[in-house]
Amino acid sequence: MKKIFFFLTIITTINCFGQGNQRKSPHDTVSATNVSVTYGRPYKNGREIFGTLEKFDQVWRLGADEATTITFDKDVKFGDNNVKAGTYAMFAIPDENKWTIILNGVTKQWGAFSYDKNKDKDVAKIKVPVKKLDNIVEQLTISFNAAQAMVIEWDKTQVIVPLNF
């Protein structure tokens, strides 16, 4: 009887501590020809995002956790800026009508907390217009369209960043 009880205890314990269905990681890497972006993908979760959670006119890591990184496999025209192939931290300064997108040479940054001490390492900055969406995008999404422009969407906000290889 003790052996059966011991065996049932072990089975129950293993079952209790086993891994359940894990949701998709909140981190993602998206790629297109010659470019990839690695970023944390936070959820809206009923919050007001731009202007409240992510303050206007303040540097944002463009995701969650570590600073978002973008890797170019070849030289690129980032707005009007010529950028060499390589990996860069990518930040945004959201505003109601336009965003500033920043490429910075220091890739290992936690969020935007150390951006101020590294802003002298900025490689490129461009301003892009904001488009208001009709539908809510629940999870921050970065993708590439057919023209290889980078599309950033979250909540009811979309910005398109031009890239030319």
Task: Please state what every model-predicted region is.
Residues 1-22:
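Bacterial Sec-dependent N-terminal signal peptides
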Residues 19-84, 89-165:
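Targeting-peptide/extracellular-domain and disordered-appendage signature
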